[in-house]
From Swiss-Prot:
Binds 1 heme c group covalently per subunit. It comes from Rickettsia felis (strain ATCC VR-1525 / URRWXCal2). It holds the Pfam family Cytochrom_C. Belongs to the cytochrome c family. This is Cytochrome c homolog. The gene is cycM.
Amino acid sequence: MSGKELNKIVAAILFASLIAMMVGFVANILYKPTLELQHRGYSVAVQESSENQNTTASEQAPVNIPELMKTANADNGREIAKKCLVCHSLDKDGPNKLGPHLWDVAGRPKASIADYKYSPALSKLGGVWDDDSLFAFLHKPSSYAPGTKMSFAGISKPQDIADVILFLKTYVHDK
């Protein structure tokens, strides 16, 4: 290929690029958008449902645990506690899984299973697992013991928590 042919090819490429650029400028002049966006993307307006508002209100309102325990249902608690079995065992002297076994947990000193390594957040709590502490922990473990390694989000309905506590208290006597 001679130098003249190479020059013709380069000139054709430059000319085509120039034409494409000119067409773009003309199109921008003719079809200039008049709308200037404040932000990118698409926003969806969502109204909070009354269910969400009630949940927030119930989380803030004090809960009468003794009254809830009077109406608690251990059979319902057994069903709700099935999600606990992913990480915990309910058997007497059962194996520790991701969490310690829950046999006889109601009334037991906190962080007291010798062969389980508790998080420092739970180890420093002290005391026993009574109705109040079980209720607070099952409602939102991360709030009751900040830094706990228990990743469970918690049980939102107070009556469900009372049912689980009653199940944990009566389970010891069923076996």
